[in-house]
Amino acid sequence: MPDFETLILERKEGLARLTINRPKSANTLNRKLMQEFNEVLDFLETDRDTRVVLLTGAGERHFCGGADLREATPETAKNMPAFGRDALTHFEDFPKPVIAVVNGAAMGGGCELAIACDFRFMAEEAKIGVPEILFGALPAGGGTQRLPRIVGLAKAKELIFTGRHLGAQEALAIGLVTAICPQKDLMARAETFAREQLIPRARYALSTAKLLVTRALDMDLASGLAFERRTIMTMASPAEMAEAREAAMKSNPAYQNIFSKK
């Protein structure tokens, strides 16, 4: 298993817990961290033991505080948005489910990182938002594109144009996060969801579903239906179909009567 400077990777029982380990810098995004995001996701993609990834921040105050402004030189300012977008898009394109465990503030690039994940479990004490416009900037890590897809066009405009942040209750109400709970229970809640609702599902079915749903809004309905048909026909091998049947019967004994029929 590779070593990392900015991340802590722990693997157990199908879960890979990935912790941004820059608490003295509010777990902000620098080039080294984004490079290691790509490296760890490449490693976990081929790790058969990893079924679900949980991403969180070290400490209790910050999930991720956005871009590390100490690296904001004229030269890095030209390349950082594209470099950051590539790293965040890696989470979106990663073929296994990723849960953002938002244990603290997720501001700017931290919010953009969270919305690049598949699910967001948020501490009741945390805040989330894209305040870049308050500083004459924009959420250039994919926020202008992903946020409308999650909360709708009107709400995304409000949040991006005003730069205001949200508490957990409002984030839940608008569909920005999946669930909220006290910080002390947050990781356990996310792990329980992963173990009970994701790990029992067939690998190929989850990865294919993620691909199809993620790309659904990128095409018109007719193109999407054709893409769905082609993808499902080409990605399910006989072995994977057998795994799907086994997973279904384990998660719900009622399926045994269906799949056992000759």
Q: Which ranges hold each PLM region?
A:
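Conserved CoA-thioester-binding segment of acyl-CoA-metabolizing enzymes
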Residues: 1-56, 89
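Catalytic-core regions built around general acid/base machinery
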Residues: 40, 83-95, 101
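C-terminal long alpha-helix characteristic of the crotonase
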Residues: 121-126, 177-226, 234, 239, ...
